[in-house]
Amino acid sequence: MTLSIIVAHDKQRVIGYQNQLPWHLPNDLKHIKQLTTGNTLVMARKTFNSIGKPLPNRRNVVLTNQASFHHEGVDVINSLDEIKELSGHVFIFGGQTLYEAMIDQVDDMYITVIDGKFQGDTFFPPYTFENWEVESSVEGQLDEKNTIPHTFLHLVRRKGK
């Protein structure tokens, strides 16, 4: 199994505000689709609720401690240990608590860095480039729908870190 994080954060590592993304960036949604189609997304229940439905053409797994949680098209797990039982390429998809729990266990991270500062109440955990090697860094294209400068980073964990 390959275990990756996929996330977008601003310069202050904001990832959300009031259970929503603080920005609208279609390029990032397209990037997520390209990377995760055919693979597995693991997200916490509140993240799933903010999306409202399973993302198509991938396995959607929701981590929750609510025994009554059920949604068509979603597999439910109740512990972090169950993530290790998944196969294929697994993407950790948020939110904050799940990122905090998994950042030291993932092989790599796909990060969209939003070049701005947004109001937020949820954050991506701190990370340093001491532990991560930049595999690629691509500037996002700006247009009438994508007006916020952004960079797509692929970071790979350094050996022994």
Swiss-Prot record:
- Answer yes or no on keyword NADP: yes
Domain of life, source organism: Bacteria
Outcome when changing Y99F:
Increases trimethoprim sensitivity
Listed InterPro entries: DHFR, DHFR-like_dom_sf, DHFR_CS, DHFR_dom
Q: Where does substrate bind?
A: I6, V7, A8, D28, R58, T112
Show where the DHFR domain sits. Answer: 2-157
Q: Which reaction does it catalyse?
A: (6S)-5,6,7,8-tetrahydrofolate + NADP(+) = 7,8-dihydrofolate + NADPH + H(+)
This protein's record includes keyword Cell membrane: no
Q: Which UniProt keywords apply?
A: Antibiotic resistance, Methotrexate resistance, NADP, One-carbon metabolism, Oxidoreductase, Plasmid, Trimethoprim resistance
Q: What is the effect of changing A44G?
A: Increases trimethoprim sensitivity
Binding sites annotated in the UniProt record for NADP(+): 7-8, 15-20, 44-47, 63-66, 93-98
Which pathway does the protein contribute to?
Cofactor biosynthesis; tetrahydrofolate biosynthesis; 5,6,7,8-tetrahydrofolate from 7,8-dihydrofolate: step 1/1
Q: Which Pfam families match?
A: DHFR_1
Q: Which GO terms describe its molecular function?
A: dihydrofolate reductase activity; NADP binding
List, alphabetically, the GO terms of the cellular component aspect: cytosol
Q: What is its EC number?
A: 1.5.1.3
Q: What does this protein do?
A: Key enzyme in folate metabolism. Catalyzes an essential reaction for de novo glycine and purine synthesis, and for DNA precursor synthesis.
Kindly give the NCBIfam families that the UniProt entry links to this protein. Answer: trim_DfrC
Family recorded in the similarity comment: Belongs to the dihydrofolate reductase family.
Additional facts recorded: There are two DhfR isozymes in S.aureus, this one is plasmid-encoded and is resistant to trimethoprim.
Query: What is the protein's name according to its record?
Result: Dihydrofolate reductase type 1 from Tn4003
- The gene it comes from is dfrA
